[in-house]
Amino acid sequence: MKNFDYITNPAKLLTPEIVQMVGSIHEHKGKQELFLEANIDELKTLLEVALIQSTGASNRIEGIFTSDKRLEELVSQKAEPRNRSEQEIAGYREVLATIHESYEYITPRPNIILQLHRDLYSYSQGNIGGTYKNSDNVIAETDAEGHQKARFIPVPAFQTAEAIDELCVRFLEAWEANLIDKLILIPMFILDFLCIHPFNDGNGRMSRLLTLLLFYKAGYIVGKYVSMEMLIEKTKETYYEALQASSVGWYEGENSYEPFVKYYLGIMLKAYNEFESRVEHLKHHNLSKPDRIKVVIDNKVGKITKKEIMELCPDISKVTVERTLTDLVKSGYIAKVGAGPSTGYVRI
């Protein structure tokens, strides 16, 4: 059985780079409360948008898709799921909402993990959720020629319950002891969870839900307002590279958690930077929406895309953004560059 060492292993991760990243996140967390107190009304918009973005992104990473319109309707509970993909999207929304509302009272123990997995599949047919895998699984990768090969072989099905029990016991011991920064401890737990791969399906989505839960419990609630799942989706290749690098030698206890920990610290830093930027833009609510879009463009060095503008101004509709960009191009305020998905705009 794998030994989950959350006492000596974390000490190996205190490299100058990781220590600097952790220190920067602590600084952002210190500002977090000030932002939350000063911008209560504006933050409601960010929360609603992040809920939609997180639900969509985490499912898309696993190849589960629906249209933007249907996604918004499902997350807003204005529609019932029509197919299997939408059932899984609706289930993710349910678990994410539970974590947002009750994270203080949710402790990552085996029975809780099983209940969250059950709820993840609460809209799905059959008894998919709430039980550990009943057959061994393999994490595969496809090479350039289209051939699949095993990248990692997780814990066998018959050892899964014991592995999750031990994982949770050791993690909670380290959490309560508080000898290591939780920013380092949390990604270590998530990596071990993914290496166990306890379910037949839904392991990736469960890992991201547990990540949010644990960061919230540690006081880092930026994921409520900026979708960390979307940031992961945008850097999916780097995510899988870090996961693979940190899983080598996992069974023997010889793996390095450093690549995966650094990846997640980078995601957290990016989330806080975006959070502060979006709050800053929301402060311009006294301006008209076209003028707010101009402020966003003025503050951007180089090219900016329509999608980036909409992410920074989540309360402004797509139609308004498109109309404003068209008007600004016509007036000579900005120039349109590129075509298709790479279309952007630059200040003249």
PLM-predicted stretches and their roles:
Residues M1-I348:
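FIC/Doc superfamily catalytic core
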